[in-house]
Amino acid sequence: MAETSLLEAGASAASTAAALENLQVEASCSVCLEYLKEPVIIECGHNFCKACITRWWEDLERDFPCPVCRKTSRYRSLRPNRQLGSMVEIAKQLQAVKRKIRDESLCPQHHEALSLFCYEDQEAVCLICAISHTHRAHTVVPLDDATQEYKEKLQKCLEPLEQKLQEITRCKSSEEKKPGELKRLVESRRQQILREFEELHRRLDEEQQVLLSRLEEEEQDILQRLRENAAHLGDKRRDLAHLAAEVEGKCLQSGFEMLKDVKSTLEKNIPRKFGGSLSTICPRDHKALLGLVKEINRCEKVKTMEVTSVSIELEKNFSNFPRQYFALRKILKQLIADVTLDPETAHPNLVLSEDRKSVKFVETRLRDLPDTPRRFTFYPCVLATEGFTSGRHYWEVEVGDKTHWAVGVCRDSVSRKGELTPLPETGYWRVRLWNGDKYAATTTPFTPLHIKVKPKRVGIFLDYEAGTLSFYNVTDRSHIYTFTDTFTEKLWPLFYPGIRAGRKNAAPLTIRPPTDWE
């Protein structure tokens, strides 16, 4: 077989060489025996170099013979043969290639063409090498066959490279589109932020108007009491001034006249003004009267202190107003959902705390529970007592050092019996932890989450109308992941405490009030 291959290779090489040699002959001038230069054709059909045939006929005036066939023509007729000129150029190029191949493809030992390929030594050899002792027992095939075989092998290697190239091309195309997508996302987020703050401003304006209205009402109330108090004090002052003038007049009287009706004078003024009874007071002398006047002045001072009392009341009313940030806190508090766990949905292996804020997994069921339509019987989870069909809601779940858990929401129509795959397509939007350090959003396929700081507490924010469910690491106040979808059913907060794996995952999941609002 090797000999047959050698013969076939030799025949193929000889045939190629003969064809090239014939082309060189046809492209040569019969006069100068070189490649035709500016080839021209004469009447008999032969071709020559223009310069050669011109010199050949130089001394002739008629009967111009052909240098090849000797046929004569009456006229010096030379027609350029441009097509032949192109073939001459091709022949020159082929000869140059042949020369280069011959120089590069010669056996260094025998100086013969390397026309064969040895499989054992994986090298090109010449005919002499192939029949020599070195390669006699080897498998030798024509170089063209080996070339074709290895081309096919390389083609197979090329296929995955082309696939990878296409993948990179698609990736590059995708990356080139991302700036535009990013611009759209940024604009969408910008509009969302503007809407959020417009809503916040609206709420703040409403709260501001309420507070200003309360302040104005409080001001008017205090002013009214101040006016009433001022009028009351004016009346008291006039009465006291009248009494003082009367007493002063008595003091100017003689002793008998002064003491004659002082008792009636004092009793008709002082009890009516101050509510006290002086029927038992019998001033004996001028010194006693002066003591009464001093007492009257002291009472006047006590009454005028009501101004100070109103002022303190004013301060007290102002201190009852919210602090500058109270309105914002009040608005934010409206987003906080009071989430409690629903025992009617709890898997039989789950135990809830008395306040229905904590849930943990137990391996042995403590009691038999009725298999109601709302209860999960395969997936060990529990839902909240209240679901959401609109609005924005926020709650936090303490996960502590647990090694396995999942939190999120599910729609009302999810399957609660039998085996299920909790994915968005089946109505579940969750973030989970398993094996202690593997976090993922349960998309299709799962989206790995690279969390730098292990969360002790997870915050969940649902914006029903916007179709977003966001998760936050409360421990370092970082964003974990956001689902974007279209919500069409009631959504229920979902809690999966994970299968108990020793003491590490024995702790419960606990719903906690947000840290900033405790």
UniProtKB/Swiss-Prot annotation:
B box-type zinc finger segments: 102-143
Known EC number: 2.3.2.27
GO cellular component: cytoplasm; cytosol; mitochondrion; nucleus
Keywords: Apoptosis, Cell cycle, Coiled coil, Cytoplasm, Metal-binding, Mitochondrion, Nucleus, Transferase, Ubl conjugation, Ubl conjugation pathway, Zinc, Zinc-finger
Tissue-wise expression: Ubiquitous; highly expressed in brain, heart, kidney, liver, skeletal muscle, spleen and testis.
Pathway entry: Protein modification; protein ubiquitination
Short name of one Pfam family: PRY
Post-translational modification: Autoubiquitinated.
Zinc finger (RING-type): 29-70
Recorded superkingdom: Eukaryota
Region (Interaction with CDKN1A): 268-337, 389-518
Family label: Belongs to the TRIM/RBCC family.
Protein name: E3 ubiquitin-protein ligase TRIM39
Species whose genome carries this gene: Homo sapiens
